[in-house]
Amino acid sequence: TYTHLLRTSHEFDSTLNNNPAIALSFRNQFIPSMSYSYTFDRAATYRNPNRLFWQTSLTQAGNIISGIEYLAGKKGSGKKIFGNVYSQFLKLTSEVIKYKQVSDNSLVATRFMGGIGYAYGNTKVMPYSEQFYIGGANSIRAFRIRSIGPGSYRPQTKSVTAYLDQTGDIKLETDIGYRFKIAGRMYGALFMDAGNVWLVRKEKERPGGEFRLKGLWKEIALGTGFGLRYDITYIVIRADLGVALHAPYDTGKAGYFNIRNYGFKDGLVLNLAIGYPF
């Protein structure tokens, strides 16, 4: 993969200037990556209606080229290929999903997913396209996509490019939902989502973003909500109303349930999507 920015805005450039790590992740670079995946899928049967799905993937980039250059006597970082710096990193992701049948018309779906990426050798920052983010219709539905993290960090500005630096090298997320039939093709769901992303290395531009075990529970965003699904055989039209319970950053309100005001500007998120979140 080759990444190259053709055109940028003033706001975008300003964000990169204020955050060197993000700027490095967006620079023109060659990503010589290979991925290896393992998938286990125990499909539901008449005797065992509970499905279990597990997928783990390992992605590595730049190691073969780096090894060849090392044997050729080229050492250090910032080495180039085709005129551009090449990325070097390892990235591990894993996702486990279980569906437990409760009755003929209802089930409980649970998901746990995690991942970690580490850049080293030729580069010190993961490419932006390989970094983790959280929130949105298929993640923590009570928070908009890329609106939380890393850690307890919160951008000081509310510009249109503020979401750019809300990514991380580590991701933890868990989701649980009770899905049931209402009538005909209409289905309902009650759900709860939790998780966040973090940085491997400490950055002064994103204070509180690094992963720490101490106080980790405070940095886990938590949301709940309910939704409707309309099944038209080939696709499922979904609407989920997410209700935030705990934000991982300082909201100015004391206590664990620290959402100050509930409204569609803060605290409530309506997600419209096609298909199930997992």
Predicted regions and their residues:
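C-terminal outer-membrane beta-barrel translocator/porin domains of Gram-negative envelope proteins
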Residues: 1-180, 190-213
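Short beta-alpha connecting loops at secondary-structure transitions
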Residues: 19, 77-80, 128-129, 208-213, ...
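Strand-connecting loop/turn motifs
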Residues: 49-51, 103-107, 183-185, 232-236, ...
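C-terminal substrate/ligand-recognition segments
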Residues: 175-184, 228-230
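Long, low-complexity, intrinsically disordered polar/charged segments
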Residues: 185-193, 273-278
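C-terminal beta-signal and adjacent terminal beta-strands/loops
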Residues: 194-210, 234, 241-260, 276-278
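A short, conserved beta-to-alpha structural element at the edge of catalytic cores
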Residues: 217-238
